[in-house]
């Protein structure tokens, strides 16, 4: 199971769905964002 877009994630785990990455611009609130 992966974390969808705008879902909460942890930057030290690769838990976002394919095509997304964990963005921590406002730590500790990290969310999955589109790679594009």
Curated annotation (Swiss-Prot):
Keyword Ribonucleoprotein found: no
Molecular functions (GO terms): sodium channel regulator activity; toxin activity
GO cellular component, one term: extracellular region
Keyword Secreted set for record: yes
Domain of life: Eukaryota
Cysteine disulfide partners in this protein: 2-17, 9-22, 16-32, 24-30
Functional summary from the UniProt entry: Insecticidal neurotoxin that induces an irreversible spastic paralysis when injected into insects. Modifies presynaptic voltage-gated sodium channels (Nav), causing them to open at the normal resting potential of the nerve. This leads to spontaneous release of neurotransmitter and repetitive action potentials in motor neurons.
Name this polypeptide is given: Mu-agatoxin-Aa1a
Lineage, broadest ranks: Eukaryota, Metazoa, Ecdysozoa, Arthropoda, Chelicerata
